[in-house]
Amino acid sequence: MAVVKSSEIEKGSFLLIKGAPHIVLEREFSKTGRGGAIVRLKLKNLKNKFVIRETLKGADTAEAIEIYEASVQYLYKDKDVLVFMDLETYDQISLDLKENANFQDKVLFLQESEIYSLIMFDNVVIDIKLAPKIAFEVVEVEAAVKGDTVTNAMKNITLNTGLIIKAPLFINVGDKVLVNSETKEYAERIKN
């Protein structure tokens, strides 16, 4: 870990703030009337996803850290433990959901044998990187009311991982759909 001056911190840098890894979302540099400088930072905690603001003086320093991505294959879920295999070393990485509650929202997006990236800091997984849109198979659909098309009519559908989303009335069991992983919303139907 390296120490960097506040004037050298840039957007996208990774810093250790109050013992937790953060990414710099915004950086604003301003000079004061007496020749001093102030750097205002907007930071996102990579563990709990909280956003904070910090102000550093020109002479202040911060601890830069290295975050790395491990390319992994999702193997299975055993009760509250997700098991991945590192594609470089073939080591298995277990992720206990009881200890990492912030991964709960990503569990329903994980599909066995698919490739993902684990964001790691100090040999600890701090995030699971998902693709912006993920393909799923529809396993169950809610009955739709015929003729209910005055507005953008939607119905609940259940996907192969158990995720339930709203989709247009024309979606049927067996269809493949793309889902936006950030908003958890239907994006489009995949044509065969």
Swiss-Prot record:
Protein localization: Cytoplasm
Pfam families (alphabetical): EFP, EFP_N, Elong-fact-P_C
SUPFAM superfamilies in the cross-refs: Nucleic acid-binding proteins, Translation proteins SH3-like domain
Protein's pathway: Protein biosynthesis; polypeptide chain elongation
Superkingdom of source: Bacteria
InterPro entries: Elong-fact-P_C (IPR015365), NA-bd_OB-fold (IPR012340), Rib_uL2_dom2 (IPR014722), Transl_elong_fac_P/YeiP (IPR020599), Transl_elong_KOW-like (IPR013185), Transl_elong_P/YeiP_cen (IPR001059), Transl_elongation_fac_P (IPR011768), Translation_prot_SH3-like_sf (IPR008991)
Example GO molecular function: translation elongation factor activity
The keyword Cell membrane is annotated on this UniProt entry: no
CDD domains, alphabetized: S1_EF-P_repeat_2
Family statement drawn from the similarity comment of this UniProt entry: Belongs to the elongation factor P family.
A GO BP annotation: peptide biosynthetic process
A GO cellular component entry from the record: cytoplasm
Function: Involved in peptide bond synthesis. Stimulates efficient translation and peptide-bond synthesis on native or reconstituted 70S ribosomes in vitro. Probably functions indirectly by altering the affinity of the ribosome for aminoacyl-tRNA, thus increasing their reactivity as acceptors for peptidyl transferase.
Keyword line: Cytoplasm, Elongation factor, Protein biosynthesis
Name of the protein this chain belongs to: Elongation factor P
